[in-house]
């Protein structure tokens, strides 16, 4: 449904210095936009007649539905017609369109889902939050670096702390993946503070 995205877009252009392109069925988006007062030069619409549902296989749907909103938006991003892309649709389709259309940053082995969670010390990031089922140590190191860059550039934290989720704070705790990742994170160009337990996330022990 377009209600929440349209309302969010209207609020964003009023409160922030941004221009937004809403991608979807034009007549539906226009009808929803008509209920709001907003600067017309700040919001435009790109028509996309197809939708990828949560019941479809993401990669197959992205390849076959060329006019799906997430595919149209990803192509616009690749062409330089936008600086960022937001989606409230099928997460798998968003990941697939990012990989198949936009592509990965050079040197990055895998994409990751980053979730900002509330904590006792403000928003904290959990990365990866579900994009990968099996990872290697080098993947986790890259996730830590990407998360650190985001927290510095978007939330303005000068030297974000990075923790490694484990079943104990001591360096030797955790499964084999955790143990192999720990020394690599120590050498990485980030502010690594060691292992943190699950309770450390809501307590804000790491950024």
Where are these regions (language model features)?
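Short, acidic/small-residue loops that bind anionic groups at enzyme active sites
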Residues: 96-130, 187-196
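Solvent-exposed alpha-helices and their adjacent loops that cap or buttress functional pockets
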Residues: 14-15, 37-38, 62, 66, ...
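Phosphate/nucleotide-donor binding subsite
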Residues: 38-82
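Glycine-rich phosphate/diphosphate-binding loop of Rossmann-like nucleotide-binding domains
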Residues: 19-21, 26-30, 133-198, 204
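N-terminal short beta-loop-beta anion/metal-coordinating cradle
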Residues: 27-54, 108-111, 115-119
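Short glycine/serine/threonine-rich phosphate/pyrophosphate-binding segments
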Residues: 1-7, 67-80, 84-98, 109-113, ...
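Short beta-strand segments
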Residues: 22-24, 46, 87-89, 116-117, ...
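N-terminal phosphate-binding or glycine-rich loops at protein starts, especially the Walker A/P-loop
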Residues: 1-31
